[in-house]
């Protein structure tokens, strides 16, 4: 009887060990602190819009992030509504160009996962966006371009002009109607080819190609892997604040730093051509 009980105990223990799936090693690359009241689960795809600290209640610059194929995140230099795009490598970028004061750049992504933001004129409806210590009213005069992504994963927002006769119902940013925790996302933007689309799962950001959002060794925000790029500083610990902005740990301030015709996004300032921004989460809709 004693041996039978010992055998059963051993069997149950082995079953428990088999069922246990330890977290990926990179998932432990998180900041030591967390955002108070932050949401770490958001399974519906959403995008990002760059909001510089120069916003006023009458003028809003929302650069929607784009992503190129390598996963990098970039933002272009133009003052107009634009969703962030992503190029193939996962990088996120924002392009540079001067335009009217009311802006919204949607982050796009290129094939490598980099994130970029380019400049395009877009029309948005008047909506209210809550940002820490201030409420911003958007009254943009152009159509919102959704975040795009190229093969390397970089995130970009492409440069394109939109006619002033654009139909609002087809291209706009507007308050979203979401149940429960999805209420944290305040606005919507039109989704287009290359638009950066991400989900938040247990504090981990995942793009539409399954790559992991991380802060890499040079402090840049981009998508790679899995696993994330070697030497990555953070690969977990992401959340959406109660104001609807993206945060890593207890920090929701990022920096867009000029790199040629694009801005790359970082979690820290890396030089003189860097400006602090918030990354506003936006719901993505087909227009």
UniProtKB/Swiss-Prot annotation:
This is Cell wall protein PIR5. Keywords: Cell wall, Cleavage on pair of basic residues, Repeat, Secreted, Signal. Component of the outer cell wall layer. May be involved in meiosis and sporulation. The PIR1/2/3 repeats are required for the covalent linkage to the cell wall. Their number varies among different strains of S.cerevisiae. The gene is PIR5. The record marks 62-63 as: Cleavage. The lineage of its organism: Eukaryota, Fungi, Dikarya, Ascomycota, Saccharomycotina. Residues 22-62 form a propeptide. It comes from Saccharomyces cerevisiae (strain ATCC 204508 / S288c). It holds the Pfam family PIR. GO terms for molecular function: structural constituent of cell wall. GO terms for cellular component: extracellular region; fungal-type cell wall; fungal-type vacuole. GO terms for biological process: fungal-type cell wall organization. PIR1/2/3 repeats lie at residues 62-80, 81-99, 104-122, 144-162. It comes from the Eukaryota. The keyword Repeat applies. Residues 1-21 form the signal peptide.
């Amino acid at each position: 009887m004693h041996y039978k009980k010992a055998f059963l105990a051993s069997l149950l223990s082995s079953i428990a060990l088999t069922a246990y799936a330890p977290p990926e090693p990179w998932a432990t690359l998180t900041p030591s602190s967390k955002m108070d009241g932050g949401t770490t689960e958001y399974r519906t795809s959403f995008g990002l819009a760059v909001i510089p600290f120069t916003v006023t209640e009458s003028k809003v610059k929302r650069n929607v992030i784009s992503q190129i194929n390598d996963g990098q995140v970039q933002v272009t230099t133009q003052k107009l509504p634009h969703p962030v795009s992503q190029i193939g490598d996962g990088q996120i970028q924002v392009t540079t160009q001067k335009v009217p004061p009311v802006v919204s750049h949607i982050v796009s992504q290129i094939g490598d996962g980099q994130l970029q933001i380019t400049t395009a004129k877009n029309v948005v409806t008047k909506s209210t966006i809550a940002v820490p210590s201030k409420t911003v009213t958007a009254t943009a005069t152009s159509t919102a371009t959704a975040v795009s992504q190229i093969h390397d994963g970089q995130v970009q927002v492409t440069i394109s002009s939109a006619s002033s006769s654009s139909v609002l119902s087809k291209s706009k940013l507007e308050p979203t109607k979401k149940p429960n925790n999805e209420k944290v996302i305040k606005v919507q933007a039109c989704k287009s080819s290359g638009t950066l689309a991400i989900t938040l799962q247990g504090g981990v950001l995942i793009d539409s190609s399954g790559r992991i959002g991380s802060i890499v060794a040079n402090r840049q925000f981009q998508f790679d892997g899995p696993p994330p790029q070697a030497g990555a500083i953070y690969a977990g610990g992401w959340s959406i604040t109660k104001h609807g902005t993206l945060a890593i740990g207890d920090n929701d301030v990022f920096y867009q730093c000029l790199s040629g015709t694009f801005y790359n996004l970082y979690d820290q300032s890396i030089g003189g051509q860097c400006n602090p921004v918030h990354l506003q989460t936006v719901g993505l809709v087909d227009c």
